[in-house]
């Protein structure tokens, strides 16, 4: 018997809801939210677009263009949130400080936030931003799942070795509460694993397909 993951259908129905420059502009703090975070150019927008089978999140050759909290509705009570990208050198310092202030406010106050999916470029994992996010997740007991993106840029063996190395580093520094996988948007590698995490956090059960 086949099993259908209900999150797939919801993600395919994802629609842009609103953009917020600060927490006060966010949707009502109810239901379920999963936030997507990542350093600039880590493939965050591409991952979101792959999971939703759409071009919801803006991709750009200039990293760091996401300047707002962007909310996408899956249904009446479930949302995906595209958080501002960080770390791009050409973004003015005052703007970076503005992003950080409101990102911290969102992460620290949002009751409906069920987990954070953190994108790391598999070729350059565990940046200072990544470690900051891991520290926050540990301190707040927030579930975190890591996508090692752009896995198609490495050979299968090199990707596996990086996965094992990052897993070991995270286990030593942040415990067993963080899960991690390889991901490639163009190859759709790891998509099903990511869907399972989303379904679990959003409390959706797999349904048998008759």
UniProtKB/Swiss-Prot annotation:
Superkingdom, natural source: Bacteria
Gene3D superfamilies: P-loop containing nucleotide triphosphate hydrolases
Keywords: Cell cycle, Cell division, GTP-binding, Magnesium, Metal-binding, Nucleotide-binding, Septation
A GO molecular-function descriptor: metal ion binding
Binding locations of Mg(2+): 45, 66
Binding site for GTP: 38-45, 64-68, 82-85, 149-152, 182-185
Pfam families in UniProt: MMR_HSR1
Segments forming domain EngB-type G: 30-204
GO CC annotations, alphabetized: cytosol
The protein's required cofactors: Mg(2+)
UniProt-listed GO biological process terms: division septum assembly
HAMAP family referenced in this protein's UniProt entry, alphabetically: GTPase_EngB
Similarity comment: Belongs to the TRAFAC class TrmE-Era-EngA-EngB-Septin-like GTPase superfamily. EngB GTPase family.
Physiological role: Necessary for normal cell division and for the maintenance of normal septation.
Name of the protein in its database record: Probable GTP-binding protein EngB
């Amino acid at each position: 018997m086949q099993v259908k993951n209900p999150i797939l259908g919801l993600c395919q129905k994802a629609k842009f809801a609103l953009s917020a420059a600060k927490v006060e502009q966010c949707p009502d703090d109810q239901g379920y939210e999963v936030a997507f975070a990542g350093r600039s150019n880590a493939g965050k927008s591409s991952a979101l677009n792959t999971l939703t089978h759409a071009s919801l999140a803006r991709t750009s050759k200039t990293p760091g263009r996401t300047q707002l909290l962007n909310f996408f509705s899956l249904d009446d009570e479930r949302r995906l949130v595209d958080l501002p990208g960080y770390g791009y050198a050409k973004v003015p310092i005052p703007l970076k400080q503005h992003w950080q202030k409101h990102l911290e406010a969102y992460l620290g106050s949002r009751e409906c936030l069920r987990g954070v999916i953190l994108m790391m470029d598999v070729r350059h994992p565990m940046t200072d931003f990544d470690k900051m996010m891991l520290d926050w997740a540990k301190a707040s007991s927030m579930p975190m799942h890591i996508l090692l993106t752009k896995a198609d840029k490495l050979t299968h063996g090199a990707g596996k070795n990086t996965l094992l190395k990052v897993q070991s580093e995270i286990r030593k520094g942040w415990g067993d509460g963080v899960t991690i996988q390889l991901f490639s948007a163009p190859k759709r590698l790891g998509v099903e694993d990511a869907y399972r995490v989303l379904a679990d956090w959003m409390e959706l059960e797999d349904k048998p397909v008759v």
